[in-house]
Curated annotation (Swiss-Prot):
Keywords: Carbohydrate metabolism, Cytoplasm, Isomerase, Metal-binding, Zinc. Belongs to the SIS family. GmhA subfamily. One of its GO terms (biological process) is carbohydrate metabolic process. One of its GO terms (molecular function) is zinc ion binding. The gene is gmhA. GO terms for cellular component: cytoplasm. It comes from the Bacteria. The reaction produces a racemic mixture of D-glycero-alpha-D-manno-heptose 7-phosphate and D-glycero-beta-D-manno-heptose 7-phosphate. Substrate binds at residues 53-55, 66, 95-96, 121-123, 126, 173. It comes from Desulfovibrio desulfuricans (strain ATCC 27774 / DSM 6949 / MB). Homotetramer. This is Phosphoheptose isomerase. Gene3D superfamilies: Glucose-6-phosphate isomerase like protein, domain 1.
């Protein structure tokens, strides 16, 4: 019996490298603009809320930790909170209301106008993430989506969209966390190294009204 493990490894590495090169070549300007808006939100005293399910929940927690602790350089802590970690709140909302509201209820409690909600869903159609984005827009928050396959229903609810045009969920997730790392690095850059670039964003109304 032939062992095709090495072929599987080679194919995955090849496909991932091709997707990564294409995505970042095409989306560099979008990532820069998104980082500027995140940095401006934080500079104005806002915060970042993040949500997702399964692997996307892990990404939400991972990125929140990078903001709160540090990324590549020592700097002040930045306010970010993953809405996936409070088991008492999650189970109470799911039990008393509905699982589709586990994030939106927290957004209603914690979100403020000018804050940013990051919703992560490889399909772009997770009901509880959609509900959270809708709640965020009602409050006047900026919405950032990490999606795949064209963005699904999330595309219409996001002011900023990191969409990975690929059918493979694992490859989408790999690009998501790499893009998230870049946004952390660029946010630090604009907050602590190139503050002048933030000037046009600090006083602009960055929320597009529906």
């Amino acid at each position: 019996m032939n062992d095709s493990a090495l072929d599987i490894i080679t194919a995955h590495a090849r496909d991932g490298a091709r997707l990564r090169e294409t995505f970042f070549a095409e989306q560099a300007t979008m990532l820069r603009e998104t980082a500027l808006r995140i940095a401006a939100c934080l500079a104005r005293g806002g915060k970042i809320l993040l949500c997702g399910n399964g692997g996307s929940a892990a990404d939400a927690q991972h990125l929140a930790a990078e903001f709160v602790n540090r990324f590549l350089v020592d700097r002040p802590a930045l306010p970010a909170l993953a809405l996936t970690t409070d088991t008492s709140a999650l189970t109470a909302i799911a039990n008393d209301m509905d699982f589709s509201q586990v994030f939106s209820r927290q957004v209603e409690a914690l979100g403020r106008k000018g804050d940013i909600l990051v919703g992560i869903s490889t399909s772009g159609n997770s009901p509880n993430v959609l509900a959270a984005l809708e709640a965020a827009r009602r409050i006047g928050m900026l919405t950032l989506g990490f999606t795949g396959r064209g963005g699904g229903r999330m595309a219409a609810l996001c002011h900023m969209l990191v969409d990975v045009a690929n059918p493979s969920t694992p490859l989408i997730q790999e690009i998501h966390i790499t893009a998230g790392h870049l946004l952390c690095q660029l946010t630090d850059y604009y907050l602590f190294e190139n503050v002048a670039a933030l000037a046009p964003y600090l006083h602009a109304d960055t929320v597009n009204e529906d």
